[in-house]
């Protein structure tokens, strides 16, 4: 009942920070000896951590699709980039039904990769580089404004919604962690310019600056911050679909609403929002395929990992890879950390499960069954 009350009475703001290429392998939190994310490692101690979460793909649009639409990756193009990508039942739908404003904030130009079309078509107000006054853009790259500038925009929007007493859900997509790896000087400690290490340290610094700035705001106590990634920095490896190259953080920080804790169960990027909604007691009807991990029976955990061509499905420590021309390969996963695989005979039941999940996502999309209205 306590949990139900968070939603029915308080309607917290939900701020989902999708960090460009924030691989768990950069973080002390996930065992890196010389951490690149000292601030996030520290923040995680006061947060609820889902420590075993995997991205569905290798592209930003896939990550945004997983977080917003909560479906496995469809073969070929991401739904975000397809023509009929509006009017879908996304994570914002149940929130708008109870009076929320939903927004998508992006540090670059949102027409890139069809993001504006997708988010606008699904009821999100767009705030991107074009909404930031030129004089405030003291640093940018070809990809977008420095992350700290994007986070300042988020705070301004949350201030506005607080004044009109409208709860708000934001999906924020950062851009600084891209080549050429340049970022504002003199902010993050020990951050070398032009190197991935430097830019990750800068982004880490800017997220915690954002949260510290938010702490002085009247809406802070009633705001939930979710920090995750769109994908890993590289999914190339010795083996096809190396599972360790898909591991991403999922940190939920809301000191007044959610007790710190940790859940180590295997979890997909498509499960993040359904799980969060479960934590704060939002009950809603959904057409999506993500699980609330806290309500899922043991043994039913499954994840999806994909590239443009290959679709991987992992269940009970076995990986099935479906590739074009109906080729199927099956592996036993001996080690998630190093992607240690042993090839095994195909398991017809597991193959069927994989095919069913992937075909269902395509079927629902193609037949307009992911739409909000029948």
Task: Pin down the residues of each PLM region.
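Soluble catalytic regions of membrane-associated enzymes that act on cell-envelope
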Residues: 1-288, 297-308
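Membrane-interface soluble catalytic domains
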Residues: 258-374
